[in-house]
Amino acid sequence: MKTFSAKAHEVTREWYVIDATDKVLGRVASEVARRLRGKHKPEFTPHVDTGDFIIIINASKLKVTGNKTLDKKYYRHSGYPGGIYETTFGKMQERFPGRALEKAVKGMLPKGPLGYAMIKKLKVYAEATHPHSAQQPKALEI
C-alpha cells in the first residue's frame, strides 16, 4: 500500500464562519490554525495547503482569561534605535479589533511560503456582517 500524498489541485476547500462572541482568544486561535492547516482532514499532507477558508465575525467581542486584558503586551519595532512600541491587548482590541486574533493564529502556523498562503485564507471581521455570503459558509461552533 502506497502512502497517500494530497495534490494541491485536488484539494476541496470549504468555507466556515465562526462567531467569536464571548469566546477565549487562544481556544479560537488554536482551532482556526488547525483548520487553516487542514489537520482535521484525513488527506492532510504537511507540505501541501489542504486547509479550509475561515471567516470570523464579532472579533471585537473576543475575551481573554484572567488579567490579560491589561497584562498581555504586544511589541513592534520601527527599526530605529529606541523605536520599540508596546500595546496591551485591551488597547489593541479598541483600536484594531481582530488584530490580536490574527497575530495569535499567525504565530501558530508554519513560517515560510506555505504558512503565508494559509494565513490568507483567514478573514476576520469586527462586526456580525461579512461580505462572503456568496461562498455559503457553514457555521462552525467552537
UniProtKB/Swiss-Prot annotation:
Q: Which is a Gene Ontology cellular component entry for this protein?
A: cytosolic large ribosomal subunit
Q: Which is one GO molecular function term here?
A: structural constituent of ribosome
Question: Can the keyword Transmembrane helix be found in this entry's annotation?
Answer: no
> Could you give a single Gene Ontology term from the biological process aspect?
translation
Which InterPro entries has this protein been placed in?
Answer: Ribosomal_uL13 (IPR005822), Ribosomal_uL13_bac-type (IPR005823), Ribosomal_uL13_sf (IPR036899)
Q: Which UniProt keywords apply?
A: Ribonucleoprotein, Ribosomal protein
* Highest taxon of source: Bacteria
Which Pfam family is an annotated match for this chain, by its short name? Ribosomal_L13
Xref: CDD domains: Ribosomal_L13
Q: Which Gene3D superfamilies match?
A: Ribosomal protein L13
Q: How does it assemble?
A: Part of the 50S ribosomal subunit.
Q: What does this protein do?
A: This protein is one of the early assembly proteins of the 50S ribosomal subunit, although it is not seen to bind rRNA by itself. It is important during the early stages of 50S assembly.
Family in the record? Belongs to the universal ribosomal protein uL13 family.
- Write down what this protein is called: Large ribosomal subunit protein uL13
Q: Which gene encodes it?
A: rplM
